[in-house]
Design a protein with these regions (language model features):
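Acidic, polar-rich low-complexity tracts and alpha-helical solenoid repeat scaffolds
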Residues: 1-295
């Protein structure tokens, strides 16, 4: 490659270093990845991949827990009015990630909105929209969350199926059991359960039906659907632990303490023992021992 006044002119080289940086990133070798990216930024400032390299550098910074550095650099990058299209989407998505990591959710929302409008990739659009819904949900902006999950549902075939199904489940969590139309709810969920395309997500849908009956105190039906969710083999261990926990709670309310204890045991097996939830259930389970002894 020719070195013209300190900057190199060889379009293949920047691409090669970019691939190298990404390979190192995926091997969790973040410092060497950063070195390759910095090399591009210093040696090929005129590269047409420069924005892409800059976004990747901040992706690495975020993995190194340097959120403040990433935020500063990305904000500077976004002041450049030549950045557009996918680069604009990627930079904003990365900025949103940095803000989410440090729990500044409202600013993450603003960045994610730009990313979702700027991306040309439907899978990304669906993912960003879904995450946006989750952020609104976290901040208890329930109406915005509901509408945002509806956007994902309306994307239909343009979105990966999992986001559509999860969005239905998220909306279901907002269902008003006192005033809501329970018949319409059951009809909608039965239709989702019967749809062949949703087969890989029966764990999510059955769990939601379980919650629906659980909230209304219909214990037998709730247990039936939680068990169905357990039987639909799930990749989501937290969902599985939630099924066991909720069945355990029902048996507990029914004063069947021995059975409740077994379900709490199954819950604990699938939970991270460092979480607050684990400790809470463990305490409840340990307290049951005395009750079971006298049962």
């Amino acid at each position: 490659s020719m070195n013209i006044a300190g900057t190199e002119k060889n379009p293949q080289m920047d691409e090669a270093y970019l691939l190298l940086a990404k390979a190192r990133y995926y091997e969790n070798r973040f410092i060497p990845s950063l070195e390759a990216l910095n090399y591009i930024l210093y040696k090929y400032p005129l590269s047409d991949r420069i924005y892409h390299a800059k976004v990747w550098r901040e992706k690495v910074n975020i993995r190194l827990d340097n959120e403040d550095v990433a935020i500063k650099n990305l904000k500077r990058l976004l002041k450049d009015d030549k950045i557009q299209g996918q680069d604009l989407a990627d930079a904003n998505a990365m900025l949103a990630q940095a803000y989410m990591n440090i729990q500044v959710k409202d600013t993450a929302i603003a960045a994610l909105k730009v990313a979702k409008e700027a991306t040309n990739d439907n899978e990304e659009k669906a993912r960003y929209t879904f995450i946006l819904g989750q952020l609104y949900e976290n901040l208890q902006y329930n109406d915005s969350a509901y509408a945002t999950f509806q956007e994902v549902i309306d994307m239909n075939r343009k979105s990966p199926r999992r986001y559509v199904v999860q969005s239905h489940a998220k909306q279901a969590l907002q269902f008003d059991y006192k005033k809501g139309d329970t018949l319409a709810f059951v009809e909608k969920f039965n239709k989702l359960l019967e749809d062949r395309e949703n087969r890989p997500y029966l764990d999510v849908l059955n769990h939601q039906m379980g919650i629906f009956y659980d909230k209304q105190g219909l214990n037998q039906k709730a247990k039936l659907y939680y068990n169905k969710s357990i039987k639909s083999v799930s990749q989501d261990s937290y969902l599985v632990s939630s099924n066991y926990r909720n069945i355990g709670e029902i048996y507990f309310k029914e004063a069947q303490y021995k059975t409740a204890g077994k379900y709490y045991d199954s819950t604990l097996l699938r939970l991270n023992d460092r979480t607050r939830e684990y400790r809470k259930i463990k305490k409840k389970r340990d307290n049951l021992e005395d009750v079971i002894k006298y049962e």
